[in-house]
Amino acid sequence: MKVVAAFLLAVLSGKASPTTGDIKDILGSVGAETEDSQIELLLKEVKGKDLAELIAAGREKLASVPSGGGGGVAVASATSGGGGGGGAPAAESKKEEKKEEKEESDDDMGFSLFE
């Protein structure tokens, strides 16, 4: 990841195609070490490609990866643009809050440590 970040910094600083030395200089300025093979692999993969195209391709790949948890529900209701989708998540959060309150009261099990 640090090699990719250094590559992006080099491109954003005005170098159209950064070299291994450019990336090593950036990483060296913050005391980060990396293997030459990692830098060479990155430069080989991005050679001749536009930065905007690389970012767009990365976004497409990330969008295709499923994310765990309830995040998909929120995205689906937010992107659906439907009228009634907003009420359901609010109702669910109220139910969860009530459950949490009940669990907290059960923690003492009927006695106090300080009595």
From Swiss-Prot:
Keywords: Phosphoprotein, Ribonucleoprotein, Ribosomal protein
Region Disordered, residue ranges: 62-115
Magnesium found in the keyword field: no
UniProt modified residues of type Phosphoserine: S105
Alphabetized GO MF terms: structural constituent of ribosome
Coiled coil feature spans: none
Gene3D superfamilies hit by this protein: 1.10.10.1410
InterPro entries linked to this entry: P1/P2_N_sf (IPR038716), Ribosomal_P1/P2 (IPR027534), Ribosomal_P2 (IPR044076)
Similarity comment text for this entry: Belongs to the eukaryotic ribosomal protein P1/P2 family.
PANTHER family: 60S ACIDIC RIBOSOMAL PROTEIN FAMILY MEMBER, LARGE RIBOSOMAL SUBUNIT PROTEIN P2Z
Subunit description: P1 and P2 exist as dimers at the large ribosomal subunit.
Function noted in UniProt: Plays an important role in the elongation step of protein synthesis.
Name the record gives this protein: Large ribosomal subunit protein P2z
Native organism: Arabidopsis thaliana
